[in-house]
Amino acid sequence: MFAVLKTGGKQYKVQAGDVLRVEKLACEAGDKIQFNDILMVGGDSVTVGAPFVAGAAVQAEVIAQIKGEKTIHYVKRRRKHSSQRTKGHRQQLTLLRVTDVLASGADASGVAAATGTADARRAAHNASAKE
């Protein structure tokens, strides 16, 4: 059985046992998380959501928080002047192992939903603003 899930603005086709590198999620290594934004579930029959499949989920285990490959950007500032600079960036990623694809019954699984780091920062900011 496979599923197409959406996280970090990207879509991934996964099945049980797959290892994924996704945009950083607010969780620690060893945590079990669940993705509820499932666009499609396939197997014996295919179910396509509009936009999401109701009750479907993908459960995964966090292996590690890692950094991606370094991308180097060469910047030349002005013509006729020798001002040049290189800038680098390493994207923060979360390494996951997919443990289960659920076509239904995701609400009763008891596994915490996956949230991105922006969601965690926003929740912390809103909590501090209320105090």
Swiss-Prot record:
Molecular function, one GO term: structural constituent of ribosome
InterPro entries tied to this protein: bL21-like, bL21-like_sf, Ribosomal_bL21
One BP term from GO: translation
Residue numbers spanned by region Disordered: 111-131
One Gene Ontology term, aspect cellular component: cytoplasm
SUPFAM superfamilies per the UniProt record, alphabetical: L21p-like (SSF141091)
Keywords, in A-Z order: Ribonucleoprotein, Ribosomal protein, RNA-binding, rRNA-binding
One Pfam family matching this protein: Ribosomal_L21p
Family in the record: Belongs to the bacterial ribosomal protein bL21 family.
Assembly description: Part of the 50S ribosomal subunit. Contacts protein L20.
Function comment: This protein binds to 23S rRNA in the presence of protein L20.
NCBIfam families: L21
Protein name, entry field: Large ribosomal subunit protein bL21
Organism of derivation: Cereibacter sphaeroides (strain ATCC 17029 / ATH 2.4.9) (Rhodobacter sphaeroides)
